[in-house]
């Protein structure tokens, strides 16, 4: 009788959920996996789940995409836990020292499941809906000591781009032949977001709105386990943890070992179903900006799960083994691994909390403080990034600090001031500080999935010291007061940073004429280096209220202009000198479409629209031959393969335009298009083979044998000709991020503005011995005059993932300053 009563109580407890909560298939009216679900429908389903289970599910809308789609998470747990959600969250942060408060025990485990960061890996969002349904209807016991956070789609814009294309293109019933059009996405594909960024490389750099809003809520929760759901090629069945080497050295033994336990539990369910899978291959834990590494460096068990499929798979496709891979298969596998991971959290909640807290204890790292010096704009930009990640920083006292000096790669010292920045590893997020700031991350295996160098001082163009002692620092509350402009002959703004370029962009769009100096300018004993912006009243007489208009723009962009009372300088040049030139209004064409790298195009598109705030005309390569080139004076070519674009006729028209004064800015792979014509002055530098070496490498060792030819995202020092307009705002050296082993000879008849000299070595990251030899005497950035115009070569992409902040001024200089020989209205 007692057992019957108990069963009745349990049944009554479940009945309200079963009566109200619909499965995804019931809600949509079609079997889940028989169609792709659009994002608004996914949001509708999660709202249905939350309204049906108000005591167990809470939705949080944490932002909107560029195309105004909702970004959201669902927090799922037991009724008791949901009642105490805020105290549980705060206890978790207090236990790791992020917030004040007593440390507590018996806290629930927190699992965060992230789906569909790559839009065309579309099965995982479908799986997210089935996962939340099964958690609530079948796994209530797990929720008693586990909080599950589900983000059903990290990239709604990219996913809907894919889903809408597929729904418009696919046959009914679907066609499993890979030759069918439904298995071949058009450019740019659904993988990236609106601005064509790979959001799974953006976690640490937070350049995109999706990332910025997500990491805010992520750091508010700080989960113990994080799973990033992906898809891979149709012939690669399923990958789950444990990860492959290299592991970053800060990853603890517990993090390594528990990945194995999770993997074994996943394997148990896959084995029961006879599903294929692999582990410990390909996907490592090193580069910090992934959806597995960022959480790992924030203390979690961070993992990538990869299902066969990707954008090619559609609703069903035959793989190379003749097996049909369906969307139902794909979402079922992801649902299974996600639930198996939650199960492991439920079984190990106490240990997860305990080890998670240990991760945030102070570590005895070699370098305990990083001291950074640079312009206020650069320091402020870095502060903004650190604040997004919840990393603490301060200002030092006026002292001399000795340690590893980034600019020389040797021991050195700097004298600090309150305008400098100190970031210490003695803080809860000290592990992430080490990862982001250390000069050269220790690499256990040179075969990696991504770049091997990213050190923030190099990326941000800051002088830095890594000190072995902790440097005392304090908080500085500063607010820069911009002196209002008074009437003067003219005004000067020094040229050092992207913020100066934003100011210039605003001036030009306000039709204010601006000059720049090609030689040092001395006024009232102050030297203004080349590239300084000179705005005179005489050039802008058409503006009736010129001073107030200029002051308004200067205040908006926080620029303190220096007034000049006369055009007569201390020494030449004077303001009216031919060496002080009016800046042309750039009329920029930016190529997109087939042949261009969507990622490279996206970096440029985002830069012009969201950072520089300067309008460009985007031209699809299919329309290249119809372009009226007289409408433009600058052509920006993203990295890509332009063989089918630059046909003989198209190349002839491009040459004619350049010779009449046009500028081409060719980035990375775009430079290939100019290597087959001697008039462009560009030649590859290839390895000189003095003696033919027989190929005796075994089949098994082929990949590893090629590592001596590889450069996997390493940082090198270049020599810079700072007198050239392309390098205005830089000193005599620049640290470049090399992404591969393609090299170009020094220009014979042009200008080698940044180049790698002899006896080079990487300051950070991996480069094979043979690849290093071939780097000597190679051009990184250069200008090749061509008639009245020129070609500007940027062989290392300064816009890469928009995180290499110190390279952006080269692109800006190419547009505004290089070959600015005649002013055009």
Q: Where in this protein do the model-derived segments appear?
A:
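Bacterial Sec-dependent N-terminal signal peptides
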Residues: 1-27
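Intrinsic-disorder/low-complexity accessory segments
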Residues: 20-122, 126-137, 141-147, 201, ...
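Substrate-binding/catalytic cleft of secreted carbohydrate-active enzymes
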Residues: 176, 192, 259, 279-280
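Core alpha/beta catalytic barrel or barrel-like domain that forms the active/cofactor pocket
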Residues: 180-205, 226-242, 304-306
